[in-house]
Every structure is written in structure tokens, then in C-alpha cells.
Amino acid sequence: MELMGSSYDGDYNNGRMEGTGEYTIPTHTRYVGEMKDGMFHGKGVLHFPNGSKYEGTWEKGICKEGKYTFSDGLKYKETDWDYCDGKDRRFYSERCNGLKPAGESQLTDPDPPRVIPDGCYDTGDGFYDPNTRVVKGYDGNFLRNADDQEHEWIVLSCRKSLDEFTGYCPRASTLEEK
């Protein structure tokens, strides 16, 4: 297990994970809960590095039901989802704390927004480099390779770093021209 970058701290039975424990995978996602025959089985919570979590009920390693909560406390709903839709574009933190004054609008839910590396996109759980097609966590650790569908979604939907430096461009004042 350690050879693969995973670790487990918990109960064993016949050399297999069984009972309650904490299993950490190489991406630093942690499962805390019940195990049976080396698999997630029973109640458990997946804690993601970005602070979000998935609470579920598992059977033989397969999640049968669960609830996802984003790192800011927003709970995902499969139906009647009204977060950041066409009717209400506020971020969850703006819903909880109110809007900022004019001229100080938020670009992202985390405020101030993260600085995105050149040529990359902010995927919400890390940065995506379209040249390598790799998503790395905000800590720089590998998260995943993006398939064609995810690549297309990221390029169309996610916030991108600036491509070029525009520099300071003073506005001509009508008073100066007179």
C-alpha cells in the first residue's frame, strides 16, 4: 500500500482492512469510515484536499447513496439546483455574506481569486495545463489526466490565466486635450 502512496490506519481482519479506519490515497483524499473485506463498506466520508466532502453509504466498495458538500459549505442538490444559474449568478459566499460594493465584485467564490499559472485554467480543485492535459492540485500534486470531454469542458467553462500582458494604458483625459 505504501509503495503506491496510499496509507491505512485502522482495524484489520485476516490481513485485510475491516472495521473502522482512515484510508488515504496518493491525491491526499481521505476516506474515514467503515471497511469490510478490504473495501469501503457501511457509512463513510471522503474528505477531499480542497476541503469538500462526500458522505455516503457504501456496499462492497460501491457508493449506494451520499451527499456532497463543497468546501464553502454549499450542499449539492441533484434537483432544484439554483446555485449560479441563469436567475442568480451570485457565489455561495455572496449569498451568505452579501454582495461587495460596486467596483469590488468577486471573480470567484474564494476571494481574492487564486493566481492561475500562465496558460492554465482553474478547475475548482486545481490547475489544468492544456499542453500536458494534466490537472494538478493547488499544492502542485498530480490529480488526474483530463480526457477529451473534460478538456473541452475546462477550456469552455473555466477561468484562464491572462495570455498576454496589456500593461498600463492611461486613458486620455478630455481636460488634457483642451
From Swiss-Prot:
MORN repeats lie at residues 8-30, 31-53, 54-75. Disulfide bonds: none annotated. GO terms for cellular component: sperm flagellum. InterPro entries: MORN (IPR003409), Morn5 (IPR042814). Pfam families: MORN. It comes from the Eukaryota. Keywords: Cell projection, Cilium, Flagellum, Repeat. It is found in: Cell projection, Cilium, Flagellum. PANTHER family: MORN REPEAT-CONTAINING PROTEIN 5. This is MORN repeat-containing protein 5. It comes from Danio rerio. The lineage of its organism: Eukaryota, Metazoa, Chordata, Craniata, Vertebrata.
